[in-house]
Amino acid sequence: SNISGQHFPADLCPKDIAYRCLSTAASDILAMGGLPTSYLLSISHPKPTDEWFNLFSDGLKSFNSRYDVELTGGDLTFGDLNIAVCFFGKAQEKILRRDSACEDDDIFISNILGRGHHGLVNYKNLDQNFFLKPELPINLTKKLNPFINACIDVSDGFLKDLGRICSASKKGAEINFSNSFVLSDLDDLIRGDDYVLCFTAHKKNRKIILEISKNVHRVGKIISGDAIKVFDESKKELSFVDFGWDSFKN
């Protein structure tokens, strides 16, 4: 469910609202090792107009064409602006879960962190596609699927979502921070809205994973226990007040 003013700016063009809502929903399918195929769409709107729905439809068509998916049904009602999307997908070789990380697994991200936040700040000016049109790593997912143990997409913040893998797998994590895998600074670890994949894999697969794409970064490893520890390049442990976005607090 995407609420105006919370999940997207209230003044956003309807075409961009549509594309972003579909992207963020389809990302969950990729995080489980699937490929998105179709979706249901429910819309509540306080002042529906033909112009708004024509622009919104343009966004749907653009996404559908880009990722070869289709709208198969839904609902429309009066109310505050809210876009609810339910995606369906087709499993690949492996269905990926959050509870399958193993001790000593490498931790990877499929692209750098911080682009979503940067795109939100600049959505009226520069780099708007980072926020408005998150790029779904469809082809990358196909190639990586056989090598992944556990996976999640980064929506609420890298450390927050990594914590969900750790909690489900009953493990901890050690992250070695580097500016090479963030757009701006340390806070990119917790800002969210990136919609990249965070995944773990056996060390024996490290070389082939890094050869699959230059955008993939190894950022740490899974450890015993339940703590998530972050170290800077001098091996000093870093601390955070929060690990990311909380829909019921933020």
Show where each model-derived region lies.
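Helix-biased detector of long, well-ordered alpha-helical tracts
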Residues: S1-N250
